[in-house]
């Protein structure tokens, strides 16, 4: 017992230097000690998706083709802060909707089960478009889902409903003439899937990325969801060509610029300015400031670059309008909407 006590004291002394304390497990709430195994059981029971394991392979010719294409990227895009070759090589492309760099779903602060419950009830109370009834979660490809108030919910679903609601409040996207959308850093196609499903009248949806694996799974996933013909996967090497063909009314960057170097951010902003994209929505990572600042994970400020590109801030609001919910609910951040000065 004395040896155990000594070890605990020594360990506590070490962890204190890094801002942590050792406490007895008996003092923790259940959600704080929930194990990886118990979280895994909360995933929806799904059979294997026919053909997924055969197609979603790193030696797939389509992925190899995209890698060759992306090798010609502008050098400004080749200094990622997070999505390095090593990081990408460790990402599970079969379970691309699981807990990974595309959508963090647990372990991190603000991603415990209570945060999911609080976010779900908040969405149910403020869902002006009725998207909790129009959209659903089936747990495919590894998505972590909880059964809350009669709905299977995931971070994919809840974040998407809140983002679509924000855009509708300020740009009336559900009722305005069909928009053409550019999704920068579209990942596996999370928001593309949700927006195209929620708003059938939505015009062409461009999914752009600088990571070949993202474009690969995005293309597969949106086809899997039956959205063929309503989206275009655009490699960063072809973005100017795509925007010359289809002018984008709205550009979005959701949790992507936060993981980019300033040179990469500036490269994308130059594209938006050159092609006259009128509105630009950005959602930053929390990065220690809960998304109230537009900084990347290195702490560099992106807002001056955005403003120098001719965009002015028109709306900035918390993801959850209630301060208590914003503090404790799922992955709190802020939503920013910019408009191109003098743009039409």
Residue ranges and their predicted role:
Residues 276-288:
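Conserved beta-strand signature within the Rossmann-like core of class I S-adenosyl-L-methionine
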Residues 68-174:
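Conserved Class I S-adenosyl-L-methionine-dependent methyltransferase catalytic core
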Residues 176-187:
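Conserved class I S-adenosyl-L-methionine
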Residues 189-200:
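Conserved SAM-binding loop of SAM-dependent methyltransferases across substrates and taxa
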Residues 1-70:
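Membrane-proximal basic amphipathic "stem/tether" segments
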Residues 260-272:
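A short, conserved alpha-helix within the catalytic core of class I
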Residues 204-209:
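Conserved SAM-binding motif I beta-strand of class I
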Residues 219-245:
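S-adenosyl-L-methionine
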């Amino acid at each position: 017992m004395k040896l155990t006590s000594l070890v605990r004291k020594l360990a506590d002394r070490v962890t204190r230097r890094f801002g942590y304390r050792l406490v007895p497990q008996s003092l923790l709430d259940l959600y704080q000690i929930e194990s990886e195994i118990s979280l895994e059981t909360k995933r929806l029971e799904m059979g294997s998706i026919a053909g997924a394991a055969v197609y979603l392979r790193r030696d797939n010719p389509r992925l190899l083709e995209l890698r060759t294409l992306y090798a010609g990227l502008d050098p400004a895009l080749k200094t990622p802060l997070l999505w390095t070759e090593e990081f990408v090589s460790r990402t599970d492309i079969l379970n691309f909707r699981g807990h990974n760099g595309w959508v963090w779903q647990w372990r991190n602060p603000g991603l415990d089960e209570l945060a999911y419950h609080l976010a779900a009830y908040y969405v149910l109370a403020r869902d002006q478009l009725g998207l909790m009834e129009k959209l659903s979660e089936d747990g495919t490809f590894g998505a972590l889902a909880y059964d809350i108030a009669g709905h299977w919910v995931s971070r994919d679903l809840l974040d998407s409903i809140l983002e679509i609601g924000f855009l509708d409040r300020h740009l009336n996207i559900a009722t305005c003439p069909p928009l053409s959308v550019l999704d920068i850093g579209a990942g596996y196609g999370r928001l593309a899937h949700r927006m195209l499903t929620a708003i059938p009248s939505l015009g062409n949806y461009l999914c752009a990325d600088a990571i070949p694996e993202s474009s690969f799974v995005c293309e597969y996933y949106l086809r899997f969801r039956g959205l063929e013909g309503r989206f275009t996967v655009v490699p960063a090497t072809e973005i100017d060509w795509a925007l010359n063909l289809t002018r984008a009314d709205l550009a979005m960057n959701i949790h992507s610029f936060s993981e980019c170097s300033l040179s990469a951010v500036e490269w994308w902003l130059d594209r938006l300015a050159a092609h006259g994209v009128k509105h630009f929505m950005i959602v930053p990572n929390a990065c220690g400031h809960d998304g109230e600042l537009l900084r990347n994970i290195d702490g560099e400020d992106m807002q001056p670059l955005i403003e120098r590109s001719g965009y002015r801030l028109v709306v900035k609001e918390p993801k959850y309008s209630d301060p208590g919910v914003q503090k404790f609910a799922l992955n709190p951040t802020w939503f920013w909407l910019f408009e191109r000065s003098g743009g039409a």
